[in-house]
Regions:
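Hydrophobic beta-strand-centered segment that forms part of the acyl-chain substrate-binding groove
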Residues: 46-55, 61-104
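Short, intrinsically disordered, mixed-charge
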Residues: 30-33, 69-73, 124
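Secondary-structure boundary/capping residues
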Residues: 37, 73-77, 112
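Catalytic strand-loop segment that frames the active site of acyl-thioester-processing enzymes
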Residues: 1-55, 140
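Residues within alpha-helical segments
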Residues: 11, 30, 58, 65, ...
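A generic structural signal for short beta-strands and their flanking turns/coil linkers
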Residues: 9-11, 16, 24, 34, ...
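HotDog/MaoC-like acyl-thioester-processing domains
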Residues: 1-9, 91-149
C-alpha cells in the first residue's frame, strides 16, 4: 500500500468538471434501470415541484469516484468499504459540476488502516449540490508494513 506524501487530512483533490447532458441521464438510466419520470419527463418534473427533469442522485454520487482523480494513479492498495451522500440542491441537464474530495482523516483499527474522504459536488454557480464521504481500507504492503508517503 502506498500513499502520496501529501495525502494527509486537509488534502484536496478535484476531478475534471463535466457539463451534464441528456446523454448522461440516458446512459445512467440504461445502466441502472432507473427510469423514473422525474429524470426525463418535463411535465412530471414540474408537477413534482422541480423546474425541469432532475439528475439522478446516484449519477452525481458516482461522479465523486476517487479513481477519477489524478492522485488515484499515485495511490495503491485502497479498497472502497463505505460511502454516504446527501443531496443538497437539484442538478439539471446543462449544469456543469466538479467533484471535490478532501482527506478528512486516517486512522487505524487493530491492524487495519482506513482513510475517510469528504466528497462534494459543486455546480457552475459554486453551490454545493452534494456532500458525502467515502471510506477506504488501506491494504498492507508485501512486507506487511503500512507506509505513508
Amino acid at each position: 500500500m502506498s500513499l502520496p506524501a501529501a495525502f494527509v487530512p486537509g488534502f484536496v483533490m478535484e476531478s475534471p468538471s463535466k457539463t451534464l447532458t441528456d446523454a448522461h441521464f440516458l446512459f445512467f438510466s440504461g445502466l441502472t434501470g432507473d427510469v423514473h419520470p422525474i429524470h426525463y419527463d418535463c411535465e412530471y418534473a414540474k408537477r413534482a415541484g422541480a423546474d425541469r427533469p432532475l439528475a439522478h442522485g446516484m449519477l452525481l454520487a458516482s461522479m465523486t469516484a476517487f479513481g477519477a482523480t489524478a492522485v488515484s494513479q499515485q495511490t495503491h492498495g485502497l479498497v472502497f468499504v463505505d460511502q454516504g451522500s446527501r443531496f443538497i440542491k437539484p442538478c439539471y441537464v446543462g449544469d456543469t459540476i466538479r467533484p471535490r474530495l478532501t482527506v478528512e482523516r486516517i486512522w487505524q483499527e487493530g491492524k487495519r488502516k482506513f482513510v475517510r474522504l469528504g466528497t462534494e459536488v459543486i455546480n457552475q454557480r459554486d453551490e454545493v449540490v452534494l456532500t458525502g464521504f467515502h471510506v477506504y481500507q488501506l491494504q498492507k504492503s508485501s512486507t506487511n508494513e503500512v507506509h505513508h508517503g
